């Protein structure tokens, strides 16, 4: 989602609250609980969940391993749910022509550096760069080139579904900033 007025443009960045993250968090949570309960059921020699039978599973070694995998999966699921709740990675890119400032804001993990805020001068922006790698794991990233700085990614790897969307976004931004486009 973009917001553009005469001299100000704001590009909002979706963080970790994506449908894919919700799906993975649910899959991991239920899978890990299933593993843990089957492993623990093999220890008790009693089915804790009626449709997950543990009668044929010996506690040592299979039950212990299933409990371990279940606990590990619960930790990973907890991590995913925390990033979703904190909305890590969300924020905005703000281009203010009146003040001549380009700002990047992102939410991070809790702590003293939770708010990540970086500013650059718009006059130092040299160009917009597109990086495209096609194939099985395609990668499409939009960068901004600034004098004396490494290229700064403006988008996440999975943000653009098509090359056309990426080209349109790069052209819009380059037109607004009056800079050139590199890549492709």
From Swiss-Prot:
Encoding gene per record: ycf4
Pfam families attached to this UniProt entry: Ycf4
Gene Ontology biological process terms from the UniProt entry: photosynthesis
Taxonomic lineage of the native organism: Eukaryota, Viridiplantae, Streptophyta, Embryophyta, Marchantiophyta
Function: Seems to be required for the assembly of the photosystem I complex.
Stretches that traverse the bilayer: 21-43, 58-80
Domain of life from the UniProt record: Eukaryota
Name of the protein this chain belongs to: Photosystem I assembly protein Ycf4
InterPro entries: PSI_Ycf4_assembly (IPR003359)
Keywords carried by this UniProt record: Chloroplast, Membrane, Photosynthesis, Plastid, Thylakoid, Transmembrane, Transmembrane helix
Compartments in which it is found: Plastid, Chloroplast thylakoid membrane
GO CC list: chloroplast thylakoid membrane; photosystem I
Organism from which the protein derives: Marchantia polymorpha (Common liverwort)
Signal peptide as annotated in the record: none
Membrane topology: Multi-pass membrane protein
Family from the record: Belongs to the Ycf4 family.
